[in-house]
Amino acid sequence: MPELPEVETVRRGLEPVLMGSRIISVSLGCKNLRFPFPESFSERLTGRIIIKLSRRAKYLLFHLSQNETIVSHLGMSGSWRVEDDLLRKKHSYMGKLVAHDHFIMSFQATNGKIYRLIYNDSRRFGFMLLADTMRLYEHPLLRNLGLEPIDNAVSGAYLQKAFINKKTSLKAALLDQSIVAGLGNIYVCEALWRSYLSPERRALTLASKSAHACELAKCLAQNICDVISEAIFSGGSSLRDYVHIDGSLGYFQHCFSVYGREGKECSRCGMHIVRIVQSGRSSFYCPQCQK
């Protein structure tokens, strides 16, 4: 599933061409993705101006004129791309993409040219909703999200407070979107490896006031922010379905230290990386380095 770095990469790719553009028409390739499209979705979008694009956690937000915002989630396999006539011919040979195009929006950019914004989703686990812009962050999907690991916003002190009485594992606590918003399986595994912390360790062990616990929490917070920053710089991680808006791939997956490396040697100690299952998700870690 695309995580914060992948969604932020998409936002940065779409923003230059979409900001200030006018929606000409919208066609839907199906009645629903994970959820049904909003009622009269095509008609409600036609003629609107896209004021700006933002992101909250793993949600991409299209702010429109008339005080409505499209809340988009990529699900497991969703992707956005922008086409003009030349790119349309190119993608016509990429059957997988064309076969699962479920949302096609024609728009006029500020340069006067006509483009198409296309949402593709083979598994249809993504979704699009319309929300009141003035009350956007009161929406049930957004109102309980925690801090984002951007620009060192997440600190050791913040994590310690969040982990008080948390009997769950560190892995589960970090996947809790009310604590750190936008983190997913990949980057939690990588941040824990960098911090020498086992995904099975209880979160509350970092919540004490001891100097050791404070240092561990501080280190973890810094590594979370660092790994997210590096992943954004690399254009995210391309695993299975995730691509940039032009169809190109991110390359942070080539920097993985543990994720997806079961049986391979840890680059620090030489011990083999192991995979365990926690709450139905794979966790990768080094049993020698991470305690």
Curated annotation (Swiss-Prot):
Coiled-coil intervals: none
InterPro entries linked to this entry: DNA_glyclase/AP_lyase_DNA-bd, DNA_glyclase_Znf_dom_DNA_BS, Formamido-pyr_DNA_Glyclase, FPG_cat, MutM-like_N-ter, Ribosomal_uS13-like_H2TH, Znf_DNA_glyclase/AP_lyase, Znf_FPG/IleRS
Keywords noted in UniProt: DNA damage, DNA repair, DNA-binding, Glycosidase, Hydrolase, Lyase, Metal-binding, Multifunctional enzyme, Zinc, Zinc-finger
Catalytic activity: Hydrolysis of DNA containing ring-opened 7-methylguanine residues, releasing 2,6-diamino-4-hydroxy-5-(N-methyl)formamidopyrimidine; 2'-deoxyribonucleotide-(2'-deoxyribose 5'-phosphate)-2'-deoxyribonucleotide-DNA = a 3'-end 2'-deoxyribonucleotide-(2,3-dehydro-2,3-deoxyribose 5'-phosphate)-DNA + a 5'-end 5'-phospho-2'-deoxyribonucleoside-DNA + H(+)
CDD domains attached to this UniProt entry: EcFpg-like_N
Cofactor note: Binds 1 zinc ion per subunit.
Protein EC: 3.2.2.23, 4.2.99.18
Zinc finger (FPG-type): 257-291
Cofactor(s) needed: Zn(2+)
Pfam families: Fapy_DNA_glyco, H2TH, zf-FPG_IleRS
Keyword Zinc-finger carried by entry: yes
Residues reported in the UniProt entry to bind DNA: 100, 123, 166
Gene3D superfamilies linked to this entry: 1.10.8.50, MutM-like, N-terminal (3.20.190.10)
Annotated GO MF terms: 8-oxo-7,8-dihydroguanine DNA N-glycosylase activity; class I DNA-(apurinic or apyrimidinic site) endonuclease activity; damaged DNA binding; zinc ion binding
Catalytic machinery residues: 2-3, 58, 281
Record-level GO BP terms: base-excision repair
NCBIfam families: fpg, PRK01103.1
Function: Involved in base excision repair of DNA damaged by oxidation or by mutagenic agents. Acts as a DNA glycosylase that recognizes and removes damaged bases. Has a preference for oxidized purines, such as 7,8-dihydro-8-oxoguanine (8-oxoG). Has AP (apurinic/apyrimidinic) lyase activity and introduces nicks in the DNA strand. Cleaves the DNA backbone by beta-delta elimination to generate a single-strand break at the site of the removed base with both 3'- and 5'-phosphates.
Family according to the record: Belongs to the FPG family.
Subunit: Monomer.
UniProt protein name: Formamidopyrimidine-DNA glycosylase
Organism: Bartonella bacilliformis (strain ATCC 35685 / KC583 / Herrer 020/F12,63)
